[in-house]
A protein has these predicted regions:
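Intrinsically disordered, low-complexity terminal regulatory regions
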Residues: 1-59, 146-151
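Short hydrophobic/aromatic beta-strand element in the GNAT-like acyltransferase core
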Residues: 44, 109, 121
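Regulatory sensory and allosteric helical modules in signal-transduction proteins
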Residues: 50, 54-100
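Sensory-domain boundary capping and coupling elements
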Residues: 113-126
Length: 151
């Protein structure tokens, strides 16, 4: 399967879906669905939002997921604690990885900021090792930048 993703097109599609929609859940639901339909070789795509000092499950596509993640735990919690994108080629080598789906082998998590604070994260998992590249990181960070402008 061709793994090339046109992130410029993906970002424009996101802008079209969310441009005139004032509802957070609606926009995040469509964003998760867009990623699910557009990215090859993934088994989960969605969001966690910061609530009461922890990450809470928000709209997603894929199997049922962990509902709460503590800051500093797992890939998502580390992304928040370090305020940095986590590109993990092999989650089984990541200290403290939380296995919500045992089929996941690689993961990318991008922090989302609103008004200068971490709002939450975009989390994408793959059953393939080394699924995510620096190109994916840059493209998904642009995708998140669009979301930051509407949340």
């Amino acid at each position: 399967m061709n793994r090339t993703v046109d992130y410029e097109l993906l970002t424009k599609q996101l802008e079209g879906l969310t441009g005139q929609v004032p509802y957070e859940i609606t926009n995040l639901s469509n964003a998760a669905a867009l990623l699910w339909e557009s990215l090859p070789d993934i088994n989960w795509a969605g969001f966690y939002k910061m609530e009461d000092g922890q990450l809470i499950l928000y709209p997603f596509q894929g199997k049922p997921a962990c509902t709460r993640i503590q800051v500093g735990r797992g890939v998502c919690g580390t992304a928040v604690a370090e305020d940095a994108t986590q590109l993990v080629p092999d989650v089984h080598e990541f200290p403290g990885h939380i296995a919500c789906d045992s089929a996941s082998n690689s993961e990318i998590v991008i922090p989302i900021h609103v008004n200068g604070k971490i709002w939450g994260v975009l989390d994408i998992d793959s059953p393939n090792l080394n699924r995510f590249t620096e190109k994916d990181k840059a493209g998904l960070e642009r995708f998140v930048a669009v979301l930051e402008g509407i949340l």
